[in-house]
Structure formats: C-alpha cells, structure tokens
Amino acid sequence: RKVLREETLNSMKAIWTKDKKDVGEDEYEEFYKHISHDWNAPLTHLHLKFEGTTEYDALLYIPSQAPFDLFNPDMKHGIHLYCKRIFIMENCRELVPEYFRFIRGVVDAPDLNLNISREILQQDRLVRNIRRNLVKKLFDLLNKMAADQYKTFWDEFGPGLKVGIHSDHENKERIAELARYTTTK
C-alpha cells in the first residue's frame, strides 16, 4: 500500500520582490533566519528597490551579533546574488566592501548576465553601480539608527568597520563619522 502526501520543502518566498509595506516584521525576521542560519533576530534591515539605469531589488540585514569569525580573512560574505529570482551565487564579495562582510541578505539584479564568472563579475559595470548604491544606503541606514541601536551595532561590528578607514579611501570620511572611541570623559 502506497500513501502519497504533499510536503512543502522550501516555504520561503522571494520577499525582496514585494513592496515594503506588504511585508511584515515577522516575515522579515523569518527570512533573515532562513538565509543567515542565525536564530537571533536581526538588528535592522534595509529593503531597497532601485529603478533607472541600474535596476535591482535588495534586502539587506545587519545581524544583532557579530559572527565568531568576523576577523577571519576567509569569512564568507553573506549576500546572495540572484537574477530574475534565479540563484546565481552565495557569498558574493563583489557587492559590498570587506568591512561590510557581516551584512546578510539578497540582491536580485534582472539585467545581470546569467553566464558570469567571478572574474567578469569584478569588472561588470552593473555590479559596480549596485555596490556603490548599496554602500551609500548602508551608510545612510547607520547614520539614521537610534543611539541605543547604534551602540549595539558599534559594540559588535565597530572594530571591523574601522578597517574601512584604511582600506576604502573613497568612503573613509563617512566611516570616520560613524567611528566611536571610548574616552575618560
């Protein structure tokens, strides 16, 4: 006797394609836990929909705790790259600078070439534009964070962000504005 039953193996939806107002906080948290394999809620998230010369959707998360291997040079970046909701690669280093390697999330670029290697990806104009826009939006998000939330962020990720002052000459002023140092006052 055979019994057939249906079981959903992958229940996650592509919530990054939805409008922000159609996604609840619980959906954001559940999706974060799915893609990051972290059981803690994220500190905050950034849901973007870019249109114009560079078109893409992005859903990025700042974890509430730094991963244990944050300073390991072999640490995987946490951004998954998609093209028209088709998975291209995980741990896409080209989308954010090294000092943002703790960021988790998804970027879906419909204009991306599907036959793309890592070497071609590094020189791709579309990927460079996406990277520039994501970095700008991440800095904006960090600048708008509430003081207590930013303190949590800085305590967890500050030392990693300080590396960017030396490695990213284009954004060193923005990183320096975010830097916090302990004083005796």
Which residues fall in each region the model found?
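Conserved GHKL (Bergerat-fold) ATPase module
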Residues: R1-K185
